Amino acid sequence: MSLGKRFLRQPAVQRLLGRLAAAYLRLVRRTNRFVIQAGNAPPGKADAWLDAHTPLIAGMWHGQHIMMPLMRRPHDRVATIISRNVDGNINTIALEHLGTRVIRASGARGRSRATDMRAKGGAEGLRAMLRALKDGESVAFSADVPKVSRRCDAGILTLARLSGRPIVPAAVVTSRHLRFKSWDRACLGLPFGRGAIVLGDPIYVPRDSAGEAFETLRRFVETEMNRVHARAYALVGRADRAALYREAAPAAVAAPVGDAA
């Protein structure tokens, strides 16, 4: 193990980095002029729209996950799922300082990540998110297939199908930002600019949805997430450049496995 990795494994270092990350995101939120659009709600009615659809399942593209905490209102109860690794430890500390509850779960091994919610954090993670939604807590997480940018994973639809709660495509962007050269073209907002939080119309997944009907819904969610992100960037006067790097979509995924609740 390298010296750098050993350094990052120190609990004190992880706590410091997590707190610094939280402080930075607060700075971004406070120094950008944000506009909020929620579904078909008229201007100034986003709060009422959110209250009417809570608890909900907020889905973002992976490159936007850094900005996710900026969506949360002070009184919102929100949970997210984070892997059990060093990066996850730092992210957990940051998110908890920003008022988001974190579900820690291990990733799946030896099964198709494109077809099973368990790949987002194991059956334990799926059950934990179902419990959160049942208790009135919204959940938010990246919805794309790991390592395949902007390809909607079947998992978010599985969660919606089992819980009966709506998927809400979401995007948080700023006019000034850093774009990383990672597989997901992750984006980190910078202070002192314009910001946009855009939430799409709620999408419900019928309990009996399967096969081609399920796949049609999956593609619709993917399309809506792209539309919401494009709209958010348009509001801040920028192009959604990460869309240019979208990898070719693989063959259509199969319907998810049976209930895991």
Set out the residue ranges of the language-model regions:
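C-terminal functional extensions of proteins
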Residues: 202, 209-233, 237
